[in-house]
Amino acid sequence: MTVEYQGQVYSLDLLTIKANGSDYISVENLFKQIGGVEYYSPIMKKVNLFFGGKNWVLSLDKGIAVAESGEEIPLGRSVVIQENSVYISPQFLNQLFGISTDTSSTVVTPSPSTT
């Protein structure tokens, strides 16, 4: 999968899942590879994300993302928690941090046809 941030393009092996008919990217896996920090607190129902000088808190119980500046963005279906790991839609990742991802480069093995 290719990831672009501020003109730099990275070719990364990212963990993804499919949920709600869409692809979601493991934030922990992505941030480890590009220098961000992700902290998920299941008890507090919050996810702290730090990258590129930006800090967002995803308040899962309230359904909003809050920036240090106080800006709020509704989460909608942008975040999925699976086995205590946080996955975010590529569109939401772009909205929060300006990170563009190309999920079309993800290899998907087609099922054999039964003709």
Regions found by a protein language model. Give the residues of each.
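Primary recognition of N-terminal secretory signal peptides and signal-anchoring hydrophobic helices
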Residues: 1-115
